[in-house]
């Protein structure tokens, strides 16, 4: 067994989701808050485009490894429309979902030992992708007192002569935090000042609520353009997690290197999925607006219910579809004869006792928290959090 591959952990979020689905298939009334996956079907016009593509013989064959030219052009146009960032189709690589985009982006720019500053809490895939690419993730931790947002001062304290990249994610998975325009600009200017690469994940760009606003970092800080990599995809915006279409936007030399890698790893993304993605990014955002309205309603319900639990504090997320409550005050307390000492143990207790699946903060680099997705039906959401409320109300010193 390769030591490098053997050291990689499985996706904790997918593991929790798989366990919940297995229990449900066995007849258990499990409610799963583990998956970051919209509960809506993919819009019909996207599905119909895929059906037509299935019948078109030209999509039965190999196509360019870097993506269908028409999809790359549409992604460039969509990027200008949605964020104001102007790029050429030659700066786009179409990938098998956002995970491949992230790995290939890091692989294209990292040499062994290069450091990547990773704000925590972070999505589980980031540090593992960095390690696979030969880099070293360096955590910079923010907590609920700052809304899980790191400061320039924290980033500067983590910077060394080996630092090559800073990761920037807004809206965030797992916390739902969104950086203000001023704070995002300050981080971008700091990165530009020190000649760092920035990898920014914009997968949740359309899922922001209230007064929060999505802003694309290279638009705020044009000086970053030559050292900025954007990863994005159709999964979250268009309820297309299973279609597996993401993309990288980067300087052309990065795209060429990443495309070469992909040509040997997977070749082109499924043509049918690419045609579906073309319909998605070329269409209007009406379906997205409806989904966002539902997520916003669920967000408010979940946060209110979580904050009614003694020992739980949940900042209000401003984007994505996750709540990230602190449960540190509950650790060590007795609950149904057990004293969970970690959020891993507490999450296991919640699943065992009330059949609700949540993801522990250890998966995101910050023990003492739980991540709950509110991308599920309203009734299931209320029932699931109610079960958690009743269980945790039994906590005693």
Curated annotation (Swiss-Prot):
Cofactors that this protein relies on: pyridoxal 5'-phosphate
Keyword Glycoprotein: no
EC number assigned by the record: 2.6.1.1
InterPro entries, alphabetized: Aminotransferase_I/II_large, AspAT/PAT-like, NHTrfase_class1_PyrdxlP-BS, PyrdxlP-dep_Trfase, PyrdxlP-dep_Trfase_major, PyrdxlP-dep_Trfase_small
Cellular component per GO, a single term: cytoplasm
Compartments, record wording: Cytoplasm
Regions that span the bilayer: none
One of the record's GO molecular function terms: pyridoxal phosphate binding
Modification N6-(pyridoxal phosphate)lysine occurs at: 236
Keyword Oxidoreductase set for record: no
Alphabetized PROSITE patterns for the sequence: AA_TRANSFER_CLASS_1 (PS00105)
Binding residues for L-aspartate: 36, 123, 173, 371
GO BP terms in the entry: amino acid metabolic process; biosynthetic process
Catalytic activity: L-aspartate + 2-oxoglutarate = oxaloacetate + L-glutamate
Entry keyword set: Aminotransferase, Cytoplasm, Pyridoxal phosphate, Transferase
Enzyme class: transferase
PANTHER family: ASPARTATE AMINOTRANSFERASE
Record family assignment: Belongs to the class-I pyridoxal-phosphate-dependent aminotransferase family.
Subunit structure: Homodimer.
Protein name per UniProt: Aspartate aminotransferase
This protein's encoding gene: aspC
